[in-house]
From Swiss-Prot:
EC code: 1.3.1.98
GO annotation, biological process: cell division; cell wall organization; peptidoglycan biosynthetic process; regulation of cell shape
NCBIfam families tied to this protein: murB, PRK13905.1
Listed cofactors: FAD
Sequence similarity: Belongs to the MurB family.
Protein name: UDP-N-acetylenolpyruvoylglucosamine reductase
Occurrences of domain FAD-binding PCMH-type (ranges): 26-191
Length: 304
């Protein structure tokens, strides 16, 4: 089959960029087109143009909590490289979406602010944290966010209050409404955080999760009142492997890439887990975003 002629854009782009380099899973084939976004105006220009030609695009940050297809992405990938933070009055901070969420938690604690201790060790960007309402059993970002600025599909700047974000367990309005999350204003408290407390949170994560191995984080949402990891472990699936993909022997709600895992191998493990738990009357919903090779136009996208 003859390869389609390359498209022409009114801005510089890269072609056939492998997404495994931009994934904490280290899985994913090439994107048709790829562009790192460094400024607000750049984001507006690119999004406005892609929307005008009805071309599918995907927004990524640190590449956590998502699984790219081995074939890649048959569209345009925008890599969020808008970094930075501003300390405001009354213990508020404005954080730009490309910034590492864990790094933000560390920086705020260092500067004498409390409220983001739970961010220690959480992979992903600030934009991804908003997109997924990231958190732990202790807290999540909904407890501190006050306002979020975005760029909609027409390239317009938008602003949402915390009530308008529709934040719930690992979810937000952006799961159904495609927008480029630009920044978040967080309300913290001026209180010196114990370094030991932050270290203990991170140490617990290191001891209980495969933090140093390629993964996308927790695969499934926790059913109400219980833990997906415990259910998978009790079903005898911990450690099960298909090819280079393995249900983590350390935490059963993680699938790790032991070397050369493919997206199909990961999806096979996900299907086995779901079908096994289904026989026990338990429906597990996956928390990670499974990004198809051929996307639907203007479908919800990953921001992590």
């Amino acid at each position: 089959m003859k390869e389609a002629a390359p498209m022409h854009f009114p801005f510089p782009v890269r072609r056939s960029v492998w997404l495994n380099r931009y994934s904490t899973f280290r899985i994913g084939g090439p994107a048709n087109y790829f562009k790192a976004i460094h400024t607000i105006e750049e984001a507006r220009e690119v999004i406005r143009f892609l929307h005008s030609i009805n071309y599918p695009f995907l927004i990524i940050g640190k590449g956590s909590n998502c699984l790219f297809d081995d074939r890649g992405f048959d569209g345009f990938v925008l890599y969020n490289a808008i970094y930075g933070k501003q300390f405001l009055e009354d213990a508020r901070i404005k954080a730009y979406s490309g910034l590492s969420f864990a790094a933000l938690g560390k920086a705020t604690a260092y500067n004498g602010y409390s409220g983001l201790e739970f961010a220690a060790g959480i992979p992903g960007s600030v934009g991804g944290a908003i997109f997924m309402n990231a958190g732990t059993n202790e807290s999540d970002i909904s407890s501190v966010v006050r306002n979020v600025e975005t760029i909609n599909s027409e390239g317009e700047l938008c602003s949402y209050s915390v009530e308008e974000l529709e934040l719930s367990y690992r979810s937000s309005r952006f799961h159904r409404q495609q927008e480029f999350i630009l920044s978040a204003t967080l309300q913290l408290s001026k209180k010196q955080v114990s370094a030991d407390h932050s270290k203990s949170i991170l140490q617990h994560r290191l001891m209980t999760q495969p933090y140093t191995q390629p993964s996308a984080g927790c695969i499934f949402r926790n059913p109400e009142g219980t833990s997906a990891g415990k259910l998978i472990d009790a079903a005898g699936l911990k450690g099960l492997a298909i090819g280079g993909a393995q249900i983590s022997p350390l935490h059963a709600n993680f699938i790790i890439n032991t070397g050369k895992a493919t997206s199909d191998e990961v999806k096979q493990l996900i299907a086995i887990i779901q079908s096994t738990l289904k026989t026990q009357g338990i429906d597990l919903e996956h928390e990670i975003r499974i990004i198809p090779y051929q996307p639907k136009i203007h479908s919800p996208v990953s921001e992590k």
